[in-house]
Curated annotation (Swiss-Prot):
It comes from Thermoplasma acidophilum (strain ATCC 25905 / DSM 1728 / JCM 9062 / NBRC 15155 / AMRC-C165). The gene is queE. This is 7-carboxy-7-deazaguanine synthase. Pathway: Purine metabolism; 7-cyano-7-deazaguanine biosynthesis. The keyword Metal-binding applies. The lineage of its organism: Archaea, Methanobacteriati, Thermoplasmatota, Thermoplasmata, Thermoplasmatales. Transmembrane segments: none annotated. Residues 16-205 form the Radical SAM core domain. Keywords: 4Fe-4S, Iron, Iron-sulfur, Lyase, Magnesium, Metal-binding, S-adenosyl-L-methionine.
Length: 209
């Protein structure tokens, strides 16, 4: 599997923020978000045999593995990796951009899906796979990064149209106004969490955390 980095840190995004995890960041992404904070994962990387990668995971003390990228689901051995980690008794949080089907990846309650819905500011051309919504479960959630009012309007409209029974995280782009987002959500009754990237609050905006 083509890997950018493997590191230990605190999960900084979404409803599982604060949990210590082993992060396995794959290389290559099938889209190019304008404000992506891991553009270094688009190129390079190191090919690590699946058996070696699983050995690293097995030795890690964390009970959670964050499988991220890049876009991890483009990796040929993605499903085999996830199945093997689940067989170890560990939880896997898959961070995916929603353009690839998750149908085969929701076979266990130990798997948790963090699925992006890309807003206008991302300036991506590859579309979100709407069929993925029907595979999301209670422990899964949709994450929308919000940079400006146009993104916020988009996010609220998406929740209005498709949000029944689904959980959402509205995540302010790093450096944007979280209070402005919160003020729009309070009192609406939406099933939305407004959460910043806490790993950047703890460590700063640097790779490997």
């Amino acid at each position: 599997m083509l890997i950018t980095e493997i590191f230990h840190s605190i999960q900084g995004e979404g409803p599982y923020a604060g949990l210590p995890m082993l992060f396995v960041r794959t290389n290559v992404c099938n889209i190019r978000c304008e404000w992506c904070d891991t553009k270094y994962s688009f190129y390079g990387g190191k090919e690590i045999p699946l058996s070696e990668l699983l050995g690293i995971v097995k030795e890690a003390k964390e009970g959670w593995v964050c499988f991220t990228g890049g876009e991890p689901l483009v990796q040929r051995d993605a499903l085999a990796f996830v199945k093997s980690v689940v067989d170890m008794g560990k939880n896997v949080l898959i961070e995916t951009n929603g353009t690839i089907s998750i149908r085969n990846f929701v076979f266990s309650d130990r798997i948790f899906i963090d699925m992006d819905v890309k807003p206008p500011s991302a300036k991506v051309t590859k579309g979100f796979l709407m069929d993925n919504l029907r595979y999301l479960r209670k422990q899964d959630y949709l994450k929308i990064v919000i940079k400006d009012d146009t993104d916020l309007d988009f996010a609220i409209d998406f929740v209005d149209r498709y949000g029944e029974g689904l959980s959402f995280v509205f995540q302010p782009a790093w450096g944007s106004d979280i209070r402005r987002i919160a003020d729009r959500i309070v009192g609406t009754g939406y099933n939305v969490r407004v959460l910043p990237q806490i790993h950047k609050i703890i460590y700063g905006d640097v790779p490997g955390v």
